[in-house]
A protein has these predicted regions:
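Extracytoplasmic
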Residues: 1-24, 101-105, 220-228
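C-terminal ends and interior cores of transmembrane alpha-helices
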Residues: 65-80, 277-306
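Central cavity-lining transmembrane alpha-helices of secondary-active solute carriers
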Residues: 31-49, 245-257
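Hydrophobic core of transmembrane alpha-helices in multi-pass small-molecule transporters
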Residues: 83-100, 297-328
């Protein structure tokens, strides 16, 4: 979960770098994120088939190798100064993130026994996910300094850190034993199954909900960063990275709440409440004038909090982190409930 958030989170501050290094539009600066998540559409079903055929462990190891290569390509884009190579790296990284999500989510839900307990375990792991997401924008914002002069190569330490994490986790995972409850046995593979996860209506609705959720979860901090660093607002990239880091920090707080009460509160109630409050926050952010400013506590690079003056809309976008935090686990838990052998 930490690796997923760390690598996915790189696309957010990289959007600022790409915008300035290649004089890209806001749309082009977000294509890295788009490429990262479009990869899910290509890899989702193959990843599930891999999980059934070779199991959790081998699928995860393969995902780590692909992720290492994806981050390596991102590093090469800085060396070559190529926008196309940057997009390729983001796309390849997306393959890895999709495969890792395919492994960790059903595994945690299964280990928790499904239901509220399964949701609780996913929320605990999600807290670790949020730690990685909190670190990335703060770290890269600190590394690039002046956004107008930022280059992809300035963020090399973050890329090296990501590759190092991949390498360490690969070694640790290679030496571990992991249960394989969803691996299809050879005799079962020969018998065609007329049904699949797509036979369940709630699974299809869950897949649509996850698709929409990911766009919201990642889109909020991305456009918050673009808005904060725009000439009209003029917030320093390092400070903007800290503001975005606060969004992810609030996601961690929300997931710790979900982990604490996930066994007592149903996924449906938790999801409905979070979505309603999140919509209210977004509406306030949309209609609040940019000239109205407030002092907002932000998570800084020295692992402390400081006060920064921001438009009130940015503060409410950051507060959305509390709402989006528990939505992934709730959606996934409800979507796979009762799938049995089709969970993978």
């Amino acid at each position: 979960f930490f690796m997923i958030s760390f690598v996915t989170g790189l696309q957010n501050p990289f959007g600022i770098i790409v915008k300035n290094q290649f004089a890209a539009s806001n749309f082009m600066s977000q294509l890295g994120n788009a490429a990262n998540f479009i990869a899910y559409a290509f890899m989702g079903i193959p990843a599930g088939m891999l999980l059934q055929k070779i199991g959790y462990k081998k699928t995860a190891l393969l995902a780590i190798i692909v992720g290492f290569c994806g981050v390596g390509i991102s590093y090469l884009s800085g060396v070559a100064g190529s926008y196309a190579v940057y997009l390729t790296g983001a796309f390849v990284s997306g393959f890895s993130m999709c495969m890792l999500n395919t492994v960790v989510n059903p595994m945690l839900n299964t280990l928790g026994g499904g239901g509220n307990k399964g949701n609780q375990l996913i929320q605990v792991a999600g807290s670790v996910n949020s730690i990685g997401a909190t670190i990335v924008p703060v770290l890269v914002g600190y590394l690039i300094g002046d956004a107008a002069k930022a280059q992809i190569s300035d963020a090399n330490p973050a890329l090296f850190l990501a590759m190092g994490i991949f390498a360490i986790v690969f070694i640790v995972l290679f030496c571990m034993q992991i249960p394989e409850p969803h691996m299809v046995k050879e005799n079962e593979a020969k018998t065609p199954d007329k049904h699949s996860a797509l036979s369940f209506r709630h699974f299809i609705l869950g897949a649509i909900a996850i698709f929409l959720y990911v766009g919201v979860e990642v889109g909020i901090p991305n456009f918050m960063n673009l808005f904060a660093t725009s000439p009209e607002i003029g917030i320093d990239p390092t400070v903007a990275g800290s503001i975005v880091g606060t969004y992810w920090f609030l996601m961690m707080i929300g997931r710790l709440f979900g982990a604490s009460f996930g066994a007592k509160i149903s996924s449906k109630a938790m999801l409905s409440s979070a979505a309603t409050v999140g919509m209210i926050f977004i509406l306030i952010a949309i209609f609040a004038p940019a000239t109205t400013k407030v002092s907002m506590p932000v998570f800084l690079s020295d692992i402390s909090f400081g006060m920064v003056e921001v438009p009130v809309g940015i503060m409410f976008m950051a507060l959305c982190g509390l709402c989006t935090s528990i939505m992934w686990g709730g959606i996934f838990n409800l979507a796979v409930e009762g799938l049995g052998k089709y969970t993978a």
